């Protein structure tokens, strides 16, 4: 049976973004160890958000692109986030 997880290599801003979200009362489920999946599932104010965290000019891997396409074909937004203000804006905090 194939493993559905891999050695976690998180972007440098991953932990800080998760901490920021939790400080604003969001529930964050960290999925970074899953293959071909988004980094975090965020639940905030009655909404669910799928987010892929990238630092700098980081690009989506082939597996992440596959996940993004799968999520979006069901009409769900797949957010690629890099900065604190961007994350807070998506949640409507700023």
Regions found by a protein language model. Give the residues of each.
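Catalytic phosphate/metal-binding cores of nucleic-acid and nucleotide-processing enzymes, i.e., regions
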Residues: 1-94
